[in-house]
Amino acid sequence: MVAKYCPIKYRYITDEAVEHGILNDYEIIIHLLDLDKSLTYKQKTKKGYFPSSELKNYNYWTEKLMNAGSFKEEQILRVMRMKSMMGYPSKERYALRLFNKITDKVILFANTQEQADRMCTHSYHSSNKASEDNLKLFKDGDIDKLSCVLQLNEGVNIPNLKQGIIMHAYGNERKSAQRLGRLLRLNPTEKAIVHILCYDNTVDTTWVQNALEQYDDSKIKWIKANE
């Protein structure tokens, strides 16, 4: 009677599953990057582009956000600032070096399809006709690097996937869980490493903290990245 009309909902969190030996252990490394101050960033305007820096662009959108006249305007500006930050080249440069340095089987979660194609010879996204072939090569172990956009289908299992790079955390615990879930399918005796790139002294740190709210702090390490 109780089970039928008053079902009990129980949330089984990731760290409990790790502790019980159902999922493999993990380590999350947050790489803190400084916004680039050099005038190499092209800021788009109605008249075209003009040279700016990542720091100036971030401050520009943050100031506009602080002076928003309505809740709707604030929402729009938050999205516009986030999209600008996702396009900053310094994070892409750092991610590419990290990606190429890793010798384990590794997946990179890019922000856009264009970025995924730039970051890796083999990419997986809806506009790439070779996506399924690339995924099969990756699953079968014929290649050890793959870039993708958002998350792969929940049913896709990739054997021996030991490391992952997340370009942007979104501040969304569910999206982060889906991405981290790709790396929690090893043998329970093994450990996966998740790299999250984050701009220091920006709203990006808040997004990362919110995304990882349900994860064990002792498994999370913040390091200063060297550009």
For every predicted segment, state its role.
Residues 182-213:
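Conserved segment of the helicase C-terminal RecA-like domain
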Residues 220-227:
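Long, largely alpha-helical accessory region at the distal end of helicase-like NTP-driven motors
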Residues 40-118:
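Conserved interdomain hinge at the start of the Helicase C-terminal
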Residues 39-40, 156-158, 173-177, 188, ...:
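Switch/connector loops and helix/strand junctions flanking conserved nucleotide-binding motifs
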Residues 16-19, 32-37, 114, 152-153, ...:
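Conserved nucleotide-binding/hydrolysis micro-motifs of P-loop NTPases
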Residues 105-110, 114-156, 175-177:
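Conserved helicase ATPase core of P-loop NTP-dependent helicases/translocases
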Residues 4-9, 119-128, 214, 220:
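Active-site regions of enzymes building and remodeling cell-envelope glycoconjugates
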Residues 1-29:
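Post-DEXD/H (motif II) to motif III coupling segment of the RecA-like Helicase ATP-binding lobe
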